[in-house]
Swiss-Prot record:
Pathway: Purine metabolism; IMP biosynthesis via de novo pathway; N(1)-(5-phospho-D-ribosyl)glycinamide from 5-phospho-alpha-D-ribose 1-diphosphate: step 2/2. GO terms for biological process: 'de novo' IMP biosynthetic process; purine nucleobase biosynthetic process. Belongs to the GARS family. This is Phosphoribosylamine--glycine ligase. Mg(2+) binds at residues 283, 285. It comes from Caldanaerobacter subterraneus subsp. tengcongensis (strain DSM 15242 / JCM 11007 / NBRC 100824 / MB4) (Thermoanaerobacter tengcongensis). The gene is purD.
Length: 417
């Protein structure tokens, strides 16, 4: 079977790696891919936004299944485009991907179908939002409605901070049209959790749980990032909690979308807060998480391609997922300055020294025969162990073997577990 993976980050490297372990996969293409992915797949120089070109490539190369990594092409309607031409593609339709593409849409669905989430108000006018922020309790969370690469969520402690964020979104328009609608949400307290499930339109098959580390600095300080590390399984979720999440959140949202005339197929990712009142939804995403995927997929024993096919064919109820009885720890190495301004093009040394962990490339490329940095998050080291402590020790031991100018990573991933 020929498979095309769309994307070029650490998540896509983990997907390509998992696919490469399937006997049924003959050839993997990845668009655009990166320096690490290029060792397992043929990288194709087409960006994730170029849907028409991706479709042409899939047709010309007789691709059997396309798997979409990032959210942007999903929200832009890549699945609808491919299906129109009879191509098999894994991911939700444009309408279904709205669950991630518009936080306001997701909140409306949750409110209508009583899916547990924080109280909220949405504004499309600056003055109305400002008036509300003058009168509200603090802290609150302000979110851009649309896609913002994980950087459109702000916790604000007082009106001064709130006005700064509002100006950023609605006056300076740093997120462009994504900030045309702004959500003000109550602050939820507890432990964060990421839950992923395969959804075939009807059935929900939950994956291994995970926990990610969003803040750039240790002790969860500093600005939000796309994720600085992750661990799997999530130490705060037991069987009872997972069951509650499935019955009160995952299944109800799939049902709610169906009632609205939207069939959801692909991966559903619920970002949750485990509060004293039970799990509540922070956000929904329409794809695999990054960097959670890098911790989850190495633990998967079931053939990945088989799961993808069962999802597309509506046959998930016949499938049972099998997992390694181990813990996974993923530590992300980033460029100095990330998530703000950073320089690229630095040579990465020591990659071949890593023997006891997986290295999943994110912002890497080839230049003059050398692997160099090309993004904010450069790579992730993923180690498995019988305990979080063992996996953590291996991950940090291995990451020390790799260097590039300005390398930065958090030293507290999986600490205390």
């Amino acid at each position: 079977m020929k498979v095309l993976v769309v994307g070029g980050g650490g998540r896509e490297h983990a997907i390509v790696h998992k696919l490469s372990q399937s006997d049924r996969v003959e050839k993997i293409y990845c668009a655009p891919g990166n320096a690490g992915i290029g060792q397992l797949a043929e990288c194709v120089n087409i960006s994730v936004e170029e849907i028409e070109k991706l479709k042409e490539f899939a047709l010309q190369n007789k691709i059997d299944i396309t798997i979409v990594g990032p959210e942007l092409p999903l929200v832009e309607g890549i699945v609808d485009e491919f299906e129109r031409t009879g191509l098999k593609i894994f991911g939700p339709s444009k309408k279904a991907a709205m669950i991630e593409g518009s936080k306001y849409f997701a909140k409306q669905i949750m409110a209508k179908y009583e899916i547990p989430t924080g109280r909220f108000k949405a504004f499309d006018r600056y003055q109305e939002a400002l008036k509300f922020l003058k009168e509200t309790w603090y802290p609150v969370v302000i979110k851009a409605d649309g896609l913002a690469q994980g950087k459109g969520v702000f916790i604000v402690r007082d009106f001064i901070e709130a006005k700064e964020v509002l100006d950023l979104m609605m006056k300076k328009r740093v997120f462009g049209p994504s900030g045309d609608i702004v959500i003000v949400e109550e602050m939820l307290y507890g432990k964060e959790a990421s839950i992923f499930a395969f959804v075939d339109g009807e059935n929900v098959l939950t994956m291994m749980t995970a926990m990610d580390y969003k803040k750039v600095y240790e002790k969860d300080e500093g600005p939000n990032t796309g994720g600085m590390g992750s661990i799997a399984p999530n130490p705060h979720i037991d069987k009872k909690t997972l069951n509650e999440i499935e019955e009160k959140i995952l299944k109800p949202v799939v049902y709610a979308l169906k009632k609205e005339g939207i069939v959801y197929k692909g991966v559903l990712y619920a970002g949750l807060m485990l509060t004293k009142e039970g799990p509540k939804v922070l956000e929904f995403n329409a794809r695999f998480g990054d960097p959670e995927t890098q911790a989850i997929l190495p633990l998967l024993k079931t053939d990945f391609l088989e799961i993808i096919e069962a999802t597309l064919e509506g046959k998930l109820k016949n499938l049972k997922l099998e997992w390694e009885d181990k813990k996974a720890v993923c530590v992300i190495a980033a460029s100095k300055g990330y998530p703000g301004e950073y320089k690229k093009g630095f040579e990465i040394r020591g990659l071949e020294e890593v023997k006891e962990a997986f290295v999943y490339h994110a912002g890497t490329s080839f230049k003059d025969g050398k692997i160099v940095t090309s993004g904010g998050r450069v790579f992730g080291i993923v180690a498995l162990g019988d305990s979080y402590k063992e996996a953590r020790e291996i991950a940090y031991r291995e990451i020390e073997k790799i260097s590039f100018e300005g390398i930065y990573y958090r030293k507290d991933i999986a600490a205390g577990y």
